[in-house]
From Swiss-Prot:
Function: Chitinase is required for cell separation during growth of S.cerevisiae.
This enzyme's EC code(s): 3.2.1.14
Gene source species: Saccharomyces cerevisiae (strain ATCC 204508 / S288c)
Gene Ontology BP annotations: cell wall organization; chitin catabolic process; polysaccharide catabolic process; septum digestion after cytokinesis
Pfam families attached to this UniProt entry: CBM_19, Glyco_hydro_18
Other known facts: Present with 6350 molecules/cell in log phase SD medium.
Chain segments carrying region Chitin-binding, high affinity: 481-562
Cellular localisation: Secreted; Secreted, Cell wall
Keyword entries, A-Z: Carbohydrate metabolism, Cell wall, Cell wall biogenesis/degradation, Chitin degradation, Chitin-binding, Glycoprotein, Glycosidase, Hydrolase, Polysaccharide degradation, Secreted, Signal
Effect of residue 461 to K: In strain: DBY939
Name listed for the protein in its UniProt record: Endochitinase
GO cellular component: cellular bud neck; endoplasmic reticulum; extracellular region; fungal-type cell wall; fungal-type vacuole; nuclear envelope
Post-translational modification: Extensively glycosylated with a series of short O-linked mannose oligosaccharides ranging in size from Man(2) to Man(5).
Main location: secreted
Length: 562
């Protein structure tokens, strides 16, 4: 065998793709690339050389079913019919893939011309995508030449759900004909369910959900509804292994709201959500923003990658410590030279005082809750469960001495408030965590539990202020048999139907309401922003138990609350 032949073989080996991507990891970062939102966009290959990003989303295929692409300043050459022909992007795709990155083509975007008339048209379009960007052979024009993307992302923002579930299902059948692993992802807005891809997420096999916690009332800084999406992943998604990504702006200029420069808040948030097997990492808009934005001289994307890695290592260490502790406990008869681990969860004998605060949607309300008790030190752990729209927390406080606490909920609460004052004292002795159910939707000023329930031997007294609605909301169809919550829901719906939103001439950041025509309304920078509800749903207030909610809900149930 000649030396030249050996060198050629070695060179080819070096050029083989290094499949470093781990779909099951919780440290992945996905970035959208192509729209040059910061004005400093570099080539796709340049960003792929960084170890801080793992998934690249080419944005966008913004016209379909008749194809139209837009990559800002990254591509301008076209075929004779006007479709972009991007030879440099094609080369970069293959470079990225050789570095172990996954490259998906994103469909949609905030602006564009795209929709399907029915499922049949969407299924036909699946073949077009496969032939034009995948391993199919039926297309005469391939914008990326021989380069083959690793899948498709649905960043649909036109509030039209028709066809996408059928498209995704058909793509799955075509992927089965391919020679590599393909992925499908979606980028829903954080309000659940999303008006554009809600049906897709509920009925199709999606690998990643890049949830946009920005430009919405729900964000990390307030009304963070991650638990709602976690419940979706675990109970609704056809793919129980779907990975949820925390979608964030790459800088302050990347979005109107939702950017987080507070690294301590980022760290605590990631630590809170990274322990779930459904957590996949962080998604960023966009590469030009996230790589050029620096905090204390460090690129934002690098900061986030380090936080993800740290959280993952902490979780791994915790599991290892727990296993060691268990082994030590079960080996009590071993020699005295053995080192025992101290259990991190200890039994606590305590008495409990329960007080329930039920928070519900309102246009204007201020709730002041005063909690007073004696000093008490507790040791335990916290575990959170959730269902759509409801958060149930089983918790005790971790070794803290509390003498008094005062919680003030202002008009940042997204929904009206129904507060039932009650003073109850119940004494129990237990070595297990005490379960306290909390139902709330609010926008706290700091990242803390919205409603505080403390285990203490004294009585907790809650003193709410008066909740009022505008005079226009009193003309409801409530009857004497209605519960207090049902009456409030009807009053709010009468207010919404009259076009009065929150009943005031101004709104407070984060307030929510419904428009007269059933749109979901959110106050953003002192102005109402309207969003269409998903197909089959409309916006109204409704009650559940002692709580009242304002959000998109099934249309056929609306008449029960008027």
């Amino acid at each position: 065998m000649s030396l030249l032949y050996i060198i050629l073989l070695f060179t080819q080996f070096l050029l083989l793709p290094t499949d470093a991507f781990d779909r099951s990891a919780n440290t992945n970062i996905a970035v959208y690339w192509g729209q040059n939102s910061a004005g400093t966009q570099e080539s796709l290959a340049t960003y792929c050389e960084s170890s801080d990003a793992d998934i690249f989303l080419l944005s966008f295929l913004n016209q379909f079913p008749t194809l139209g692409l837009n990559f800002a300043n990254a591509c301008s050459d076209t075929f004779s019919d006007g479709l972009l022909h991007c030879t440099q992007i094609a080369e970069d795709i293959e470079t990225c893939q050789s570095l172990g990155k996954k490259v998906l083509l994103s469909l949609g975007g905030a602006s564009g011309s795209y929709l399907f008339s029915d499922d049949s048209q969407a299924e036909t379009f699946a073949q077009t995508l496969w032939d034009t960007f995948g391993e199919g052979t039926g297309a005469s024009e391939r914008p990326f030449d021989s380069a083959v993307v690793d899948g498709f992302d649905f960043d649909i923002e036109n509030n039209n759900e028709v066809g996408y579930s059928a498209l995704a299902t058909k793509l799955r059948t075509l992927f089965a004909e391919g020679t590599k692993q393909y992925y499908l992802s979606a980028a829903p807005q954080c309000p659940y369910p999303d008006a554009s891809v809600g049906d897709l997420l509920e009925n199709a096999d999606i690998d990643f959900a890049f949830i946009q916690f920005y430009n919405n009332y729900c964000s990390v800084s307030g009304q963070f509804n991650w638990d709602t999406w976690l419940t979706y992943a675990q109970t609704v998604s056809p793919n129980k292994n779907i990975k949820l990504f925390l979608g964030l702006p790459g800088s302050a200029s990347a979005a109107g709201s939702g950017y987080i420069s507070d690294t301590s808040l980022l760290e605590s948030t990631i630590a809170d959500i990274a322990s779930s097997s459904s957590f996949g990492g962080i998604a960023l808009w966009d590469a030009s923003q996230a790589f050029s934005n620096e905090l204390n001289g460090e690129p934002y994307v690098e900061i986030l990658k380090n936080l993800l890695t740290s959280a993952s290592q902490t979780a791994t260490t915790t599991v290892a410590t727990s296993k060691t502790s268990a082994a030590s406990t079960s080996s009590a008869s071993t020699s005295s030279a053995s080192t025992s681990q101290k259990k991190t969860t200890q039994s606590t004998t305590s008495t409990q005082s329960k007080s329930k605060v039920t928070l519900s949607p309102t246009a204007s309300s201020a709730i002041k809750t005063s909690i007073t008790q004696t000093t008490k030190t507790l040791t335990s752990s916290t575990k959170t469960k959730s269902s759509l729209g409801t958060t149930t927390t089983e918790s005790t406080l971790n070794s803290v001495a509390i003498t008094s606490m005062k919680t003030t909920l202002s008009s940042q609460i997204t929904s009206a408030a129904l507060v039932t004052p009650q003073t109850t004292t119940t004494s129990i002795v237990s070595s297990a965590p005490i379960q306290t159910a909390i139902t709330s939707t609010l926008s706290p000023a700091t990242k803390s539990s919205s409603v505080v329930s403390l285990q203490t031997a004294t009585t907790s007294t809650l003193s709410p202020t008066t909740t009022s609605t505008s005079s226009g909301s009193t003309s409801s169809g409530s009857t004497s048999s209605d519960s207090t919550a049902r009456t409030l829901a009807k009053e709010l719906n009468a207010q919404y139907a009259a076009g009065k939103l929150n009943g005031k001439s101004t709104c407070t950041e984060g307030e929510i309401a419904c428009s007269a025509d059933g749109k979901f309304a959110v106050c953003d920078h002192s102005a109402w922003v309207y969003m269409e509800c998903a197909s089959g749903t409309t916006c109204y207030a409704y009650d559940s138990g002692d709580s009242v909610y304002t959000q998109c809900n099934f249309s056929y149930l609306e008449s029960n609350y008027f």
